Design a protein with these regions (language model features):
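Positively charged n-region of N-terminal signal peptides that target proteins for export
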Residues: 1-5
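C-terminal motif of bacterial Sec signal peptides marking the signal peptidase cleavage site
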Residues: 16-19
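Short structured motifs
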Residues: 52, 68, 100-102, 114-120, ...
Length: 183
């Protein structure tokens, strides 16, 4: 039973990163240099407050926040086609086809609901935006009925693609003090 509980927690953690990608994937030297040069996310995820980016045009702010809301709603509804419509076709943090396969498997094995608070556009450029949110996740592994609660901070990176904002990568830091597993 402990092994199944551990597996449930491990799978949940991996899915929390949903679009973070395959760590075995090799990136080119140019891409690696760009990541180092640009930084992984454009602000500090640790600490108290995340400041709202001041340079966001009103129309883009509405569109970005609507895209984030749809991304979370699609995950919570566990609707794979709807979820994949929120994902970039050319993501930086994962492979599109692998994400679809993986998300389908997770949707089949878990009932996961995400509650988000303090949603803030923390960094903005005309073609990329970083959305910060505090997140609480409630999951149930369907086969074992093992429940898990977790909380953390997530940055969802969006890119402008075909005049819409799509998820290109996700960064998550869990808060172990707010996590629990039980039946």
């Amino acid at each position: 039973m402990l092994k199944k509980s551990f597996l449930a927690v491990l799978i949940l953690f991996v899915f929390t990163l949903a679009a973070c990608g395959n760590k075995e994937e090799k990136i080119s030297d140019d891409d690696r240099e760009k990541v180092i040069e640009d930084g992984t996310v454009g602000f500090e995820m640790m600490g108290g407050n995340v400041e709202k980016a001041e340079n966001v045009p009103e129309a883009d702010e509405k569109a970005i926040l609507a895209s984030f809301d749809e991304y979370i709603a699609a995950l919570n509804a566990e609707e794979i086609d709807r979820y994949m419509k929120t994902i970039s076709k050319n993501p930086k943090g994962f492979k599109y086809d692998e994400e679809k396969t993986y998300a389908t498997e997770v949707f089949d094995q878990f009932d996961i609901k995400r509650d988000v608070e303090n949603v803030t556009i923390a960094k903005y450029a005309p073609e990329e935006a970083q959305v910060f949110a505090n997140m609480k996740m409630h999951s149930l592994q369907l086969e074992t009925n093992v429940e898990h609660e977790s909380a953390g901070r997530q940055v969802t990176v969006f890119v402008k693609e075909d005049d819409a904002w799509k998820v290109t990568s996700v960064f998550y830091i869990g808060d172990d003090s707010q996590s629990s597993t039980g039946n």
